[in-house]
């Protein structure tokens, strides 16, 4: 293969398609224009979505581009693998009603082999399961059938980008890199093919045959014109053509690494060499492996951050900005492995800009602003990072000293609550120290803290301001999550205090604050109040007589009246509150629109984890109604309505149709929140700026809190992802446990009732939701219900089959039969046998009695069983004994009367039962005596 630079590969590709009459279209921004369903531009076709659907007039019918893209779905593995990046460039060629499959396949193969220089003999191809046409075309182009694989929808059906748009089956080109790149089992198994998880086959070109338009409900409609959408990752193509070990060893990324080498004094090649040594009991190799990952992470993240800020996406506490902030903080943390203790990312801006400025000149114009922004973010994070890292080192050492291998959830929560360490960051750090992370324990601690803040601090708010001079608190939180304020009141143990010291719990009142106090259903904010080393952790925020009280505890230092504090709200938590509060408004709008104006709000809880909404409605919602409501809310999210807030005289607010909360008291002026045509409500809470920020909405549960009212519990945004991840994790466990039980207890006989559902994993769930939005919500709802139904059906079939097998084993069990005969009574006319068992149904007793009668001609069988809630009895006899006067039906009726139940039957077979199972022994004994009297004439 030809060894070309990244810029040469880019130009070869674009010029090839330019010669094929394609318009060369510049890359669009990483900020998707007019598409609220996407956080970032994630593929080359994003800017062409309207052209595929025919929504706009075509300026051209074929195009080519090299598109800037940003994806964070695989963030945790970036730096650890040889091919994952968050930022990358996507080469692509596109047809809008022009050419289709044959030309697209021909272009892909011709460009790959004859212009880029790929070895045709090493190219493998995948096609969609039933795409015979594509396979036939590939064969005619010289790709043998044995190098063409058919894969399903997960691998070979693409799109849309977002929750609606063009989509269709696809065909991918893979390069066989040799058996040495395969996994441990691939070399010996001989089954390694495209689609295998190893690195032997690397996909480098994807051709999507756009034939459908998917609406927001997930329905597919034929496109008026078919289209072609191809994607070829530039960095990945460079990896293959340059024979590099990873994308980070390609020429452009390797140049960025060289800048870090200069700053750190550490040589990347030395790190790579040392990292290949066995890491077991080799500290040098482990350090090198960590440094290798660090070089790669900071190299990747600087590109993502630089290009994002260059396109106007600045670090923030929410949405896209939060992703960029997280990338900067992650890079800062990894930079410590390269001995960077001070801000360093900003120093690379000018040098990285020089690499990409020829292709993206806008970077040069914005480099100063980019540099300044990154420096400010690094300085902000480094303020708390040092203390947090010292603490985590202590906690890791404590864990290891105690002989444990799991880093406790309680310790992780301490880092989260005190130092602001995200759980995923702690997990990465402790993993490097060889410790597992107790996710469940962390979640439990998180929940306990929430419960504590909801209950403990609520009790303290009662009448704290009674007798105090009241100064109304100025609320800053609509526009900011941080700000300065002076202490005007302090409370300790429900009493006014002059100071609060380390370890003490209490409440602080500031003259102004960004902390939102509980109200309108929205729970109070949490966060920190700081002055230097004086730190007060806010666990809850409440309001009394227009005064906002911050309840919590002093973590360090001391607080006194008149101190000026820096107040900082927990941003990620507030973001989720905004999602759920705005989602609640849309839900209220959906209910009133779909169910009627009789719907009145009866109660509401807006928490970071979920929303709960009580409303007046006479009957339970049907499954169809729930889906309609969910769809209505998601459609309002998709429309990305601006969220407008304004203060109005209450009468003016009523005139514009603002909905008030039933039973709530309002002043002369009210705050109104409007979301397009979807919702207008009185509300003092915090909200998103556009409904599209919410992402998606899912109804978890519908129930009744009381007569005449209904309750909906739902989730928005990231909580939807977590809900489905938890739901499918539970389903996975249920499927595995059930299948294991079926296999172990039924052997081969249970193979037909095994649950064969393909349960999606957490990464797949996140990626699909982030990519497809509301469509994925419906998909996962349907899939989870389908799998749950399969589990229920298989469980029922398992119990039935197990019971049948147990019954069969019981009926034919020789030892049981011998035991029953061992206690037989010979009357001289015929034998009477009886027995009492536990938990046997009448059919099992009947089967056993039939087998007993086979052994003896003149036989009366009386069998009983004590079950969980009752007793059952079966009496049968041979025809010879019927002729002697035995009537099984009469005997059963007698027994059942003593059991407090009913029964009956024919002379030779009868059955019955009753709830008074404690009488079973005496009842059967009495039946034996009656039968003996009938057969022998002896009186009972």
From Swiss-Prot:
UniProt binding sites for Zn(2+) = 581, 585, 683, 687
Kindly list the places in or outside the cell where this protein is found, as annotated in its UniProt entry: Cytoplasm
Q: What is its EC number?
A: 6.1.1.7
Q: Which keywords appear in this protein's UniProt record, sorted alphabetically?
A: Aminoacyl-tRNA synthetase, ATP-binding, Cytoplasm, Ligase, Metal-binding, Nucleotide-binding, Protein biosynthesis, RNA-binding, tRNA-binding, Zinc
Paste the cofactor note: Binds 1 zinc ion per subunit.
This entry's Gene Ontology molecular function terms read: alanine-tRNA ligase activity; aminoacyl-tRNA deacylase activity; ATP binding; tRNA binding; zinc ion binding
* CDD domains linked to this entry: AlaRS_core
Which GO terms fall under biological process for this protein?
Answer: alanyl-tRNA aminoacylation
Q: Which InterPro entries match?
A: aa-tRNA-synth_II/BPL/LPL, Ala-tRNA-lgiase_IIc, Ala-tRNA-ligase_IIc_anticod-bd, Ala-tRNA-synth_IIc_core, Ala-tRNA-synth_IIc_N, Ala-tRNA_ligase, Ala_tRNA_ligase_euk/bac, DHHA1_dom
Lineage: superkingdom: Bacteria
List residues traversing the bilayer: none
Please give the catalytic activity noted in the UniProt record. Answer: tRNA(Ala) + L-alanine + ATP = L-alanyl-tRNA(Ala) + AMP + diphosphate
- Mind telling me which GO cellular component terms the entry cites? cytosol
Question: Which Gene3D superfamilies does the record associate with it?
Answer: 2.40.30.130, 3.10.310.40, 3.30.54.20, Bira Bifunctional Protein, Domain 2, Threonyl-trna Synthetase, Chain A, domain 2
Q: Which cofactor does it need?
A: Zn(2+)
The UniProt entry, under NCBIfam families, shows:
alaS
Family membership: Belongs to the class-II aminoacyl-tRNA synthetase family.
Q: Please describe what this protein does.
A: Catalyzes the attachment of alanine to tRNA(Ala) in a two-step reaction: alanine is first activated by ATP to form Ala-AMP and then transferred to the acceptor end of tRNA(Ala). Also edits incorrectly charged Ser-tRNA(Ala) and Gly-tRNA(Ala) via its editing domain.
Anything noted about its domains? Consists of three domains; the N-terminal catalytic domain, the editing domain and the C-terminal C-Ala domain. The editing domain removes incorrectly charged amino acids, while the C-Ala domain, along with tRNA(Ala), serves as a bridge to cooperatively bring together the editing and aminoacylation centers thus stimulating deacylation of misacylated tRNAs.
Q: Which PANTHER family match?
A: ALANINE--TRNA LIGASE, CYTOPLASMIC, ALANYL-TRNA SYNTHETASE
Q: What is this protein called?
A: Alanine--tRNA ligase
| Source organism (scientific name) | Leptospira borgpetersenii serovar Hardjo-bovis (strain L550)
